[in-house]
Amino acid sequence: MKVKIEESWKEVLNNEFNKEYFKKLVKFIKHEYKTKNGKIFPPPKLIFNAFNSLPFKDIKVVIIGQDPYHGKNQANGLAFSVDSKIKIPPSLQNIFKEIEKSLKIKTIPNGDLKRWAIQGVFLINTILTVEEGKPSSHKAIGWEIFTDEVIKIISKNLKNIVFMLWGNLARSKKGLIDPTKHLILETSHPSPYSANNGFLGSNHFSSALDYLKKHNKNIINFQ
């Protein structure tokens, strides 16, 4: 089936788009957008924003989130990201805090992470849609099957990618990644409830830049 997505992704995911589970997923999601009167996030055109912001072969870092923010006007299709006019959520505040400490730089007070995506950071949630005010409302409808396959395809077809796995859900994806080809960084989720259990002080961002330099890749400006 036809999916509006960046051409290089269309090529690597075409088989997935034609599987029965994905067809059922699309049918369900279309019905949700049609019947829930603007209460499904992100807007339809932004569901695949992570893919459309970054060609497949340009990926350098993968950050795995959970499901989109469920507040109005927050989710923009990039994990942990919000539109520039929206207040920066607590988890992203902690991400910026860790960047400033780890890299000794000042971050831009802007929650739109498109600036990272265009440099090679693939910001993928395990679930790509959500109903307003209902976290995990689109769990187990097919998105996890799809995003697991995306992670496996990245691991198999690319090399020397940094995978940042924050929190139990993201860390459960470790088995999908080939540790002989990639750098896997694990710690707690940046949420205020768990950031002090390892995320703050993890130095993931400095480790990522060191790894990219080691493998002769252009480093990322995480400001």
UniProtKB/Swiss-Prot annotation:
What EC designation does it have?
Answer: 3.2.2.27
Reactions catalysed, semicolon-separated, are: Hydrolyzes single-stranded DNA or mismatched double-stranded DNA and polynucleotides, releasing free uracil
Question: Catalytic residues?
Answer: 67
Q: Decide whether keyword Membrane is in the record.
A: no
* KW Transferase (keyword) present: no
InterPro entries, alphabetized:
UDG_fam1 (IPR002043), Ura-DNA_Glyclase_AS (IPR018085), Uracil-DNA_glycosylase-like (IPR005122), Uracil-DNA_glycosylase-like_sf (IPR036895)
Query: What are the subcellular locations of this protein?
Result: Cytoplasm
Q: Name one Pfam family in it.
A: UDG
Q: Which UniProt keywords apply?
A: Cytoplasm, DNA damage, DNA repair, Hydrolase
GO cellular-component term (any)? cytoplasm
Q: Which domain of life is it from?
A: Bacteria
Q: What does this protein do?
A: Excises uracil residues from the DNA which can arise as a result of misincorporation of dUMP residues by DNA polymerase or due to deamination of cytosine.
Similarity annotation: Belongs to the uracil-DNA glycosylase (UDG) superfamily. UNG family.
What name has this protein been given in UniProt?
A: Uracil-DNA glycosylase
- Annotated organism of origin: Borreliella burgdorferi (strain ATCC 35210 / DSM 4680 / CIP 102532 / B31)
Lineage, top ranks: Bacteria, Pseudomonadati, Spirochaetota, Spirochaetia, Spirochaetales
**What would be the name of the gene that encodes this protein?**
ung
